[in-house]
């Protein structure tokens, strides 16, 4: 089996996907613009061959690379990066080289937030009031329905990038004076907490691994206010969230992929609203958190499914609450690293520096903490972030 891994070096922890594929007997073909010598040794050892291009955004270079791989290794069976950024590129390459997976005719409904909304509504799933707006006049019509505050986000975008919270008409006018020339979705601001329905499906689209995350704060607020965030896996997925998550799975026909679905749980009603879908693993160190929460290896599980051997952990369970805790270097904290490890060293599974691309949301340094008790991980998170 031949697997083309786009940008296998990033995010840094995703090299483990390539290692797991090799361990399953798959031929792993790396494709990126990174210098080969800068790849970590474990990734080099996992790759059968690495093809370096001058620019990953030059589609013709990518086509030549896949042509080279096809000539030397035969039919290409899969291509992926596990990155939102390359979803469209992957889909185009799959279409042009007849590789199974998401194709170009499917990409809009998993990239455009407006198309996601349409799918949610068609499936009978509640969403925040809002729509694509053309101009200020159109936006003011929407305000009559929703009131302020509003959230403005690009129809195509990742995370909280280029997202704004608008409190009144002056800010709304300023937004239209300065917004980029792309479609923007305006929605009512929902007071609530983000929760997720995550997992992986087998080749038939059946979910074989499930997880849910809860966040201490919204990612948008964290980025806009330069705040701190922690988030944690749950040991049990709430029934209403799982029921809704499974409906979203059916609506989007997810096969042989990780998925990361985001919802709001409203403060006043406790009800759920669908926010967006992501056809990739949750970001940051979350895949490692899955491992620590369940004492399994999700990299191996994914590779086993790709290799046609099925999900290897049918009896898995969430043994721990597992929490990611971020710290930013522009803070004066109450506790230094030595004090953190003295207090919670028995619960800290992992800690590392975070790539600058993610630091605005996740912090410059991250700790992963686990315990069978939720109170323990929240207490540790608050201790680590105390200022």
Locate the predicted segments by residue.
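ATP-binding N-terminal substructure of ATP-dependent carboxylate-amine bond-forming enzymes
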Residues: 1-105, 311, 372-387
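Short beta-strand-to-turn element immediately C-terminal to the catalytic PLP-Schiff-base lysine
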Residues: 133, 163-168, 200-202, 231-232, ...
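Conserved protein kinase catalytic/activation segment
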Residues: 270-272
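Short acidic-hydrophobic, aromatic-tinged amphipathic segments that line or gate anion-handling sites
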Residues: 50-57, 131-135, 164-167
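Conserved ATP-binding module of the ATP-grasp superfamily
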Residues: 126-128, 145, 149-152, 161-196, ...
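A conserved helix-loop-beta module that forms one wall/lid of the active-site cleft
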Residues: 95-162
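ATP-dependent carboxylate/phosphate-activation module, predominantly the ATP-grasp catalytic core
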Residues: 188-254, 258, 267-268, 278-306, ...
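Peripheral (often C-terminal) accessory segments that flank ATP-dependent C-N-forming ligase machineries
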Residues: 301-387
């Amino acid at each position: 089996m031949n697997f083309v891994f786009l940008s296998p070096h990033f995010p840094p922890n995703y090299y483990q996907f390539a290692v797991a594929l090799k361990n399953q007997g798959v031929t792993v073909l790396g494709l990126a613009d990174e210098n080969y010598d800068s790849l970590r040794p474990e990734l080099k050892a996992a790759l059968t061959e690495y093809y370096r291009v001058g620019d990953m955004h030059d589609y013709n270079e990518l086509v030549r690379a896949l042509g080279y791989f096809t000539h030397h290794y035969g039919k290409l069976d899969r291509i992926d990066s596990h990155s939102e950024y390359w979803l469209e590129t992957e889909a185009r390459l799959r279409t042009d080289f007849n590789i199974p997976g998401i194709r170009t005719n499917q990409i809009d409904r998993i990239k455009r937030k407006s198309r996601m909304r349409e799918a949610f509504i068609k499936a009978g799933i509640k969403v925040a009031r809002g729509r694509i707006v053309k101009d200020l006049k159109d936006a003011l019509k929407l305000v009559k329905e929703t009131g302020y505050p509003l959230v403005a986000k690009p129809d195509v975008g990742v995370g909280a990038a280029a997202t704004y919270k608008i409190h009144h008409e002056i800010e709304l006018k300023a937004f239209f004076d300065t917004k980029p020339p792309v479609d923007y979705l305006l929605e009512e601001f929902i007071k609530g907490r983000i929760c997720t329905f995550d997992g992986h499906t087998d080749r038939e689209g059946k979910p074989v691994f499930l997880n849910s995350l809860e966040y201490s704060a919204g990612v948008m607020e964290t980025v806009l206010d330069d705040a701190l965030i922690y988030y944690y896996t749950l040991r049990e997925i709430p029934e209403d969230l799982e029921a809704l998550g499974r409906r979203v799975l059916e609506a989007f026909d997810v096969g042989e992929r990780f998925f990361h679905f985001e919802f709001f749980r409203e403060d006043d009603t406790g009800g759920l609203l669908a926010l967006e879908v992501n056809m990739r693993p949750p970001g940051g160190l979350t895949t490692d958190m899955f491992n620590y929460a369940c004492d399994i290896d999700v990299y191996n599980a994914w590779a086993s499914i790709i290799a046609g051997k099925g999900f290897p952990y049918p009896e898995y369970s969430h043994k721990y609450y597992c929490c990611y805790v971020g710290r930013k270097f522009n803070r004066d904290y109450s506790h230094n690293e030595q004090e953190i490890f003295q207090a919670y060293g028995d619960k800290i599974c992992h800690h590392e520096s975070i790539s600058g691309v993610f630091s605005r949301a996740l912090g410059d340094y991250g700790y992963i903490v686990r315990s069978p008790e939720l109170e323990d991980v929240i207490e540790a998170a608050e201790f680590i972030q105390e200022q």
